[in-house]
Each structure stands twice: as C-alpha cells, then as structure tokens.
Amino acid sequence: MLCWIGYKNGILPQQNSTLYPWLNPSKCGVIFDGFQLVGDDFNSDQTAENTSPAWQVLYTTHLQSCSPIHSGENFAPIPLYKQLKNQPHLSQDLIKWQENWQACDQLQMNGAVLEQQSLAEISDHQSTLSKHGRYLAQEIEKETGIPTYYYLYRVGGQSLESEKSRCCPSCGANWALKDAIFDTFHFKCDTCRLVSNLSWNFL
C-alpha cells in the first residue's frame, strides 16, 4: 500500500523530500522501510542546477506549473525556495503575479471574452500586470544580485520587416538580437531589463 503524508515542506523537488527532516512518518504512526526510483517523470519540469546564473528572466505561460524565474543559461526554471528563501513574501507575490499572467494568457488564447484586455496586460510594458512584474523583477535582482529580465509577450504586427526593426518600448533603443535566445527571445534590452519575442504571427 502506498501512503502519502502531506506537509508544508513535502513539495521540495529533491528525491529525499519525503524523508526526515522534511517529514517524520513515525510521528504519524507510519513505518517507512525505503523507496525505489522507478524512472523520471518526463512531463515534469527539470529545474536548473545552477541557481546563480549570469542572468535570468521572469517568464511564464498558461501551460506552465513551474517557477516563473528561468535561468539565462539554459532556460530551466529556478525553484523559488532556493533563490528567495529569505524573502517568502516576495515568493508569494511572485506566485500571485504568475497566476494573473497565466489567467490573461489563457483568456487571450481562447480568443473570446476579454481577449484584447488580457492581451494588453501581457504585451504592454505599461500595463498594470507588466508594471507589477517589472517591479518584482527589480526586487528579485536586488535580493539575488542577478540581472533579472521581464518578458513581454508579442503577437500581431504589420509585417516581418517591421517586427524585426521595432525598438525597445521602454527606452526606444535598438534591442533586436542577431540570434534568438532559446528560440524564444528575439529582442533584449539590457538597460530596461526587457526581453520579447518576434510576433508569433511571423514565427
């Protein structure tokens, strides 16, 4: 018989997260003899081994269930409890921002109710959601000392040529990259800490 004992620290991704000191089964009247790793869950997100990359980005989608902080080295998510363990309130605020971003992303993907409003929230750098996210990115950078960028979603546009020539929406500087990062980010402004994609209409 398999038994799972819930505890606030039991969500840690390490293989021993269900062992003492994270859990103490004996206190719950359960005797644990051992465990066996059967295989990897290929539907799960592999977290970044290096939690102090040269740079990182605040990025999420309506499909993700992992940390919204992604490494600039390999785009793998960085667990919040590793990077923000001394700032639990920041982690909670970040999760709320992620929930709001994903809700807007889902609405604009559905293409019906509140499509335009939701799209504006995740694509306009001056929207309420983007301002909140950029603030969080700044706070994360202060806490970690790691340059933390904010992702601006992009869809629409007049043509591929006009898309490639668009400037940073915050400072107006040229931010087009010669080569896309992770096949996702085609624009990057180091001054404003913003990254974005080439419009999905032309990818």
From Swiss-Prot:
Protein name: Uncharacterized protein HI_1341
UniProt organism field: Haemophilus influenzae (strain ATCC 51907 / DSM 11121 / KW20 / Rd)
